[in-house]
Amino acid sequence: MTSTDTQRDVVELLLEARQVVSLAESLAHQSCTTETRELAQHVSDVVEWVLPLHCADEDESVTSRLTGRNTVVDAALTQMRREHLALDAPMARVRLLCRMVARDVSRLHALRFELEAAATDLRARLERHQTFEESAVIPALKRLLFADELTAIADEMRARRQSLAA
């Protein structure tokens, strides 16, 4: 695998959280069916583990390798950690609403607007966060880390996901 392929793998794994919000937004526009209940359960499950994995990837694998290499990058890493903490409540809100729909799909009618608002809020926060990461953290990964370090990050990220699949 080339260094560019490894960089792409790391970046793609860091950006996978975007897919979660699209699922939550689509859920708000569904009919009350068994498939909708299953989608709500799926979104709840994914929010419960994908976004925390994203934070763990950055906090455990990325930050540990970038800290101390550049003062501007150190400040960006501090901001990134703060943003992760600020995502906890919006994620919990989406997860709770999806669980409520998964338990009783007929509640979707009553929760539709709240779910859409929660998903929209989470999307806006994630987009700001990911825009920041794409402008500050990801370029630092590419600029400051060697190929073997990027490979180690990608391996750690995959291992976190494999432990969930097991």
Language-model segments: what does each one mean?
Residues M1-A166:
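Small-residue-biased structural context
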